[in-house]
Amino acid sequence: MTKDLLLELGLEELPAYVVTPSEKQLGQKMVKFLEDHRLSFETVQIFSTPRRLAVRVKGLADQQTDLTEDFKGPSKKIALDAEGNFSKAAQGFVRGKGLSVDDIEFREVKGEEYVYVTKHETGKSAIDVLASVTEVLTELTFPVNMHWANNSFEYIRPVHTLVVLLDDQALELDFLDIHSGRISRGHRFLGSDTEISSASSYEDDLRQQFVIADAKERQQMIVNQIHAIEEKKNISVEIDEDLLNEVLNLVEYPTAFLGSFDEKYLDVPEEVLVTSMKNHQRYFVVRDRDGKLLPNFISVRNGNAEHIENVIKGNEKVLVARLEDGEFFWQEDQKLNIADLVEKLKQVTFHEKIGSLYEHMDRVKVISQYLAEKADLSDEEKLAVLRAASIYKFDLLTGMVDEFDELQGIMGEKYALLAGEQPAVAAAIREHYMPTSADGELPETRVGAILALADKFDTLLSFFSVGLIPSGSNDPYALRRATQGIVRILEAFGWDIPLDELVTNLYGLSFASLDYANQKEVMAFISARIEKMIGSKVPKDIREAVLESDTYIVSLILEASQALVQKSKDAQYKVSVESLSRAFNLAEKVTHSVLVDSSLFENNQEKALYQAILSLELTEDMHDNLDKLFALSPIINDFFDNTMVMTDDEKMKQNRLAILNSLVAKARTVAAFNLLNTK
């Protein structure tokens, strides 16, 4: 016989960004609890609103499954003393399992007998097991926690109710300072406290109190309501997924509505209006069927349609205040002078240990010129890079960016164009922030890409130079994101500039006092970002092998990983990798540089391998390079079969190691083959 279990935790309003991850966590913790306690079930369903997290288990067994376990103990010769009695070791072993020596039997394992005991455990009733089910709540983790009242414990928000039902039976449990029951809270304004009659009636009981407990149902309600308004008003609404998920977790009973604002605000840049609506007010942006921005918005009320006209007016009033600010800053900022703003950046701190934003820009100017040369930009592009690098942070001192910091770079482009700057310069000011996330948009122009690289390189090197290096998940200056941007831009634009050369030369340009160890740390940090870019679907040994190669060009490292993944499916992969790996391992024994002396060759295999190495021409085509290296496998194996590398003759040994070292030097441009797993 099976039953349904309901567990609901009622809290004060959760931050929207916490709700969905916490809901998923709760479901996962419940599944683990049931599996660990041998309680079978059919399905687990999760629920969440801003004021509750809940999980329902359907088809829960009324009793644990019985458990039978075999335990292996000491060998028979240790378990029995000279008189054939059980030793203290045997007695201690069975005592630890809650059994006696009468339960011992001997079983043969690989020719020797060992003590074995079999323990049978009868399953407990589900109710007995569920006495500890609040463990799943204790084990939830949150980004931040808080104290409340005089309690010593911490949790994401104060807890008010706990409902635990097995079918219609309320289980009496405690969590923190809350005793469980069947009372849940309805909508803060439209509902009231209500009894949940049974686990199966959970959604219906709450629906009567204006709470839609199922997040997916709530989301679909919002989408359907928006589509209905679209159809009725012949408009088009941008349903941004991130915004939808946020709004979803701000309401328990959603009602979407259409609001409006004065058309005069459409003269303000669209980005300002969209940011005001979307980022600040959590409104959905409205356009006509051709994509033109309209003086309207859609918002979602946490409640029903009663007195909705008052809600609309209130939302319109709040938005207009934002738009008034935007309009004011748009007009006032145009009176400012770019040169004056750049000069004022001398007084703005980039970081107290690093200097001002002006100094940061000065370094970026030098770095960007170097990068523009390496990337073979045209003279016109180089001039644009130089100009952009000289002014690109000026918009940080405008009123608009001070109020709407999401618009940095975007407003810089607009103000630069109004001031008569070249379009390439203006675009670079916007693009230098790209990408803003791990998979965000990249710069479209070469000028913008160079400025973005220079800015990110200086940021990375500056913070490393003063010891502000990310550790664990802590990365307050977003250096991982900046570095991810560096490798993505280099790869996307096909700029095959070796990273080790870049780091060394950029340190020389702007950070001459920094030592080699510091540069090694930077390279390791960049390698970690490249590994992330390669992706976890590529086996770990292949990722490590290409990152330990002597190639520091992003595109070639990525190509090498793909080539190895492809080759790993071939029948010859194991043999080829093992022959190269053997060469790598022996080459590590080279203690000093020795040139190959062909007069010391004793057999044809030495000569054949050395000639093959001399003839080996590797290119930037990693697939072709692997083909060429793997083709050497028979020659390498023939060499090893007929040649004693580590001979007692020191000259001969060093000469043979030199042959292998010359092979490894070429092969390492693809990968460190000795790190590849062929098991």
From Swiss-Prot:
It catalyses: tRNA(Gly) + glycine + ATP = glycyl-tRNA(Gly) + AMP + diphosphate. It is found in: Cytoplasm. Keywords: Aminoacyl-tRNA synthetase, ATP-binding, Cytoplasm, Ligase, Nucleotide-binding, Protein biosynthesis. One of its GO terms (cellular component) is cytosol. One of its GO terms (molecular function) is ATP binding. Its main location: cytoplasm. Transmembrane segments: none annotated. GO terms for biological process: arginyl-tRNA aminoacylation; glycyl-tRNA aminoacylation. It holds the Pfam family tRNA_synt_2f. It is an enzyme of class 6 (ligase). InterPro entries: DALR_anticod-bd, Gly-tRNA-synth_bsu, Gly-tRNA-synth_heterodimer. SUPFAM superfamilies: HD-domain/PDEase-like. Its EC number is 6.1.1.14. Belongs to the class-II aminoacyl-tRNA synthetase family. Tetramer of two alpha and two beta subunits. This is Glycine--tRNA ligase beta subunit.
